[in-house]
Amino acid sequence: MSTEVISTSVVSEPTQEILPAEYSLDAPEPEHCPGPESEMAGKADACQTCENKDICESLPKGPDPDIPLITENLSGIKHKILVLSGKGGVGKSTFTTMLSWALSADDNLQVGAMDLDICGPSLPHMLGCTDEVVHESNTGWTPVYVAENLAAMSIQFMLPEDDSAVIWRGNKKNLLIKKFLKDVVWDDLDYLVVDTPPGTSDEHISINKYMKESGIDGALVVTTPQEVALLDVRKEIDFCRKAGINILGLVENMSGFVCPNCKGESQIFKPTTGGGEALCKELGIKFLGSVPLDPRIGRCSDEGESFLDEFPDSPATLAVLNVVEELRDAVGDV
């Protein structure tokens, strides 16, 4: 089977690939473009002053033909988990990385980590595989294997430079998300962990739309204890409920500071309104646990090492492992 490295052209101008061969756009898409494949193409507010309006209105509409292909490609994955946060900076991607390391520590599990933070990908750096490339064969795209039983996929692997910016609007993001779901050869996985950007944006709407038929186990929501983070988490939970996404539970990250020397713990971000646990009781969702802040987590993330393996006795490690057990119980895996 022949393979070749995925070219950076894949991430340069992908919009045209979602159009039928006989159509072409006259101008770049405007901000808030619903995408030429959308039911709202040519009808949305953003379309009214767009030069492509007539083209998009004339495109054939109907069920997305890629969704059955996505469902088939993901049929070998037992559990699909979205990692969400209402606000950036709460450690969502860091927790996604630690969750992936923790699950793959079980040699009997096959794990995939998919980075959907398209404009700010960070999983490859934290997993220690930034120098790897994605290969394409006649069966599809091969993800990068961090370990024998841990595969990763990110746009970062396809960028010409580590610090290259991805300046895309919704429809370009949608195309890449489709490719990650339809064309990546994930094979049989026990878990696919999906890291998403903060908030409720195009990526969240698209991943839910494209994966709904294949079955999403649910969302793991990450927050920090202070009220300003909880305010946005409430919006994230509201989004999940309106979108029909099951909420597996909430993790309170950075709930205290652990001194690496004395192992003493002190509060950095005070839970002024009761923190994540109180929020879970109020909203009737499962509280998966609290994870304290250990400064060595940042160092391990920077160096692409597993904090759980490097510091197995840290209170943060023990807390993460407890959360993983609660999560596995929530999806019926233990």
From Swiss-Prot:
UniProt keyword Nucleotidyltransferase, yes or no: no
Any one of the GO CC terms: cytosolic [4Fe-4S] assembly scaffold complex
Residues the record lists as binding ATP: G86, K87, G88, G89, V90, G91, K92, S93
One Pfam family from the record: ParA
Keyword annotations of the record: 4Fe-4S, ATP-binding, Cytoplasm, Iron, Iron-sulfur, Metal-binding, Nucleotide-binding, Nucleus
Amino acids binding [4Fe-4S] cluster 1: C33, C47, C50, C56
Gene3D superfamilies: P-loop containing nucleotide triphosphate hydrolases
Cofactor(s) for this UniProt protein: [4Fe-4S] cluster
Free-text cofactor note: Binds 4 [4Fe-4S] clusters per heterotetramer. Contains two stable clusters in the N-termini of NBP35 and two labile, bridging clusters between subunits of the NBP35-CFD1 heterotetramer.
Recorded superkingdom: Eukaryota
Residues that hold [4Fe-4S] cluster 2 according to the record: C259, C262
A Gene Ontology biological process term: iron-sulfur cluster assembly
Molecular function GO labels: 4 iron, 4 sulfur cluster binding; ATP binding; ATP hydrolysis activity; ATP-dependent FeS chaperone activity; iron ion binding
Subcellular location: Cytoplasm; Nucleus
Keyword Cytoplasm: yes
UniProt subunit comment: Heterotetramer of 2 NBP35 and 2 CFD1 chains.
Role this protein plays: Component of the cytosolic iron-sulfur (Fe/S) protein assembly (CIA) machinery. Required for maturation of extramitochondrial Fe-S proteins. The NBP35-CFD1 heterotetramer forms a Fe-S scaffold complex, mediating the de novo assembly of an Fe-S cluster and its transfer to target apoproteins. Required for biogenesis and export of both ribosomal subunits, which may reflect a role in assembly of the Fe/S clusters in RLI1, a protein which performs rRNA processing and ribosome export.
Family the UniProt entry places it in: Belongs to the Mrp/NBP35 ATP-binding proteins family. NUBP1/NBP35 subfamily.
Protein name per UniProt: Cytosolic Fe-S cluster assembly factor NBP35
Organism listed in the record: Candida glabrata (strain ATCC 2001 / BCRC 20586 / JCM 3761 / NBRC 0622 / NRRL Y-65 / CBS 138) (Yeast)
